[in-house]
Amino acid sequence: MKISIGLGKEGVEERLAERGVSRRDFLKFCTAIAVTMGMGPAFAPEVARALMGPRRPSVVYLHNAECTGCSESVLRAFEPYIDTLILDTLSLDYHETIMAAAGDAAEAALEQAVNSPHGFIAVVEGGIPTAANGIYGKVANHTMLDICSRILPKAQAVIAYGTCATFGGVQAAKPNPTGAKGVNDALKHLGVKAINIAGCPPNPYNLVGTIVYYLKNKAAPELDSLNRPTMFFGQTVHEQCPRLPHFDAGEFAPSFESEEARKGWCLYELGCKGPVTMNNCPKIKFNQTNWPVDAGHPCIGCSEPDFWDAMTPFYQN
């Protein structure tokens, strides 16, 4: 079976117009990505140029040990909605959850994508089980460890999407019987150096922003010591939090049902991990609408290594 990889009309603008998406809406999306990247609205035309080539970027999305919450974060996104993102902006050539193909046809699509002369970007969701030669996780009778070991070294760029893929996440919580690891820990012997987009779930704008940066610069963005892009993970949640003035004033909510909590006082005494968590949640929010602290819940430190072990109990500081 021959499957079209990364092809379309002249460019993304024409494909979007055919689907009723205006240039204005497309530039609005590009502006949101530019702001997420810390470049400001003036950078939106550069984002547009990176996405408007005649060939859409081919993306291979692999699933390992996970709950599919990271995929849900993309599927629930708007501006653009997921159909616009995967049909007109990117060429998502393999994604087990949403692809139409199944069985042998799905495997054929994967093989064609990873062997395309035009190359591909790999996005990985979920921790990689490594114990007992990876026997705890299989797809199409191949261990997830074997699949990632075979495919990821071929990719032009590898993006570990979500805390399970970056640091092991809940899959690696003690006692971790499956030996689950993040991509870089599991495959460092193969020279794989994934860009880590941490979060449980991660923000889809951080994923698209990373892809845009790579398309424009043909290189990974500046990374911190944990391989996270500093344009998204360069500050703590605490430093960007709208409740920071209350922290500085020593005004802490004593309980969730208190009047102080309703007034927006700091949630540090209720377990907020914002001071030790690097992420841009207060800046971009989810769907540019809300994020946990604005909704009255403490940050649980989900974008940090070992957060299921190191950050619990969640409601103690």
From Swiss-Prot:
Subcellular location field: Periplasm
Residue sites binding [3Fe-4S] cluster per the record: C281, C299, C302
Comment on bound cofactor: Binds 2 [4Fe-4S] clusters.
- Report the leader peptide range: 1-50
- A biological-process GO annotation: anaerobic respiration
Q: How is it modified after translation?
A: Predicted to be exported by the Tat system. The position of the signal peptide cleavage has been experimentally proven.
Q: Which cofactor does it need?
A: [4Fe-4S] cluster; [3Fe-4S] cluster
The UniProt record lists the keyword Nucleus: no
Question: Can you tell me which residues bind [4Fe-4S] cluster 2?
Answer: H238, C241, C266, C272
S-S pairs: none
Q: Principal localization? A: periplasm
Please list the residues that bind [4Fe-4S] cluster 1.
Answer: C67, C70, C164, C200
Any one annotated GO CC term:
membrane
Cited Gene3D superfamilies:
Cytochrome-c3 hydrogenase, C-terminal domain (4.10.480.10), NADH:ubiquinone oxidoreductase-like, 20kDa subunit (3.40.50.700)
Q: What is its EC number?
A: 1.12.2.1
Task: State a single Gene Ontology molecular function.
Answer: metal ion binding
**Keyword Iron annotated:** yes
Task: State the reactions this protein catalyses.
Answer: 2 Fe(III)-[cytochrome c3] + H2 = 2 Fe(II)-[cytochrome c3] + 2 H(+)
- Its job: Catalyzes the reversible oxidoreduction of molecular hydrogen, in conjunction with a specific electron acceptor, cytochrome c3.
Subunit structure as annotated in this protein's UniProt entry: Heterodimer of a large and a small subunit.
Q: What is this protein called?
A: Periplasmic [NiFe] hydrogenase small subunit
